[in-house]
Amino acid sequence: MSEELKYNEPWILQRADPYVYRHTDGNYYFTASIPAYDRIVLRRSETLAGLKDAEEVTVWEKHKEGIMSEHIWAPELHYLDGKWYIYFAGGDKDDIWAIRPYVLECADTDPLTGAWTEKGKMGRADADEFSFEAFSLDATVFENKGKHYYVWAEKVGVGKQISNLYIGEMETPYKLKTVQVLLTSPDYDWERVGFWVNEGPAVIHHDGRIYLTYSASETGAAYCMGMLTADEDSDLLDPKSWTKERYPVLRTDESRGIYGPGHNSFTEDEEGNPVMVYHARTEAEIEGNPLYNPNRHAMLMKIRWDEKKGAPIFSYED
């Protein structure tokens, strides 16, 4: 298996915001943003390497008008409470930047052939007046100590928009139980290139710690990854439980021709070794708006652990 996989080079072309989930039956599932931003696709394979050439199935298409009719972004596939869920963001043809988080549900065994039901916009907690009122996207879900948490990016501010990361405990797969808690804002210069951005959260657990990676800055060569860390026994809804890295944990490497790495997810290979799935570009210069340039490619990276700190090591060295 390891000989078939090539790391830190284009793996699945023109698939941004890549997400890989290994189900309990051993199968791997892949989804991502596609260049047209008009549908949600899934792939399945018995091996991680097999996802590259696996058949791609469209399981949902954007609406012709109204909500969920433009900018279908960053889908993630999760299996919760015996059902499949896809979390994604979408806009409105009449207001393309009215990006909000939405949920699809599938009660069938096979998510590629089963019927998907729209659960609508992600529901906020009853006491929450603010979540998902503004530009909101890039949601992920993770479990800790029997509780499920929802982490997403949302813009705030008038004039200079700032994209922060928020967290909430989930009541159901499509509604929050708690009011939003601010996890991180773009505090540092490397998070403020072009736009002030924290987005694309992803979570990996190791040795009693929770590592939450995220992406920062505009989507060109300046795009990079930061990280937060919390103890799994701490109160994850207390911002003080999280420690933020001062510098990016992964960024452009011109010598390797890897530009703007980010919006990652975590999975494992067939031997159970952790693997990061991320997107990056292979060219430094981009014509036009980087958002609409299709050449963000899904790539793979082996994850190793720092023996002293216990933290993940993000390295382009195979």
What are these regions (language model features)?
Residues 1-318:
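Carbohydrate-active catalytic/glycan-binding domains of CAZyme proteins
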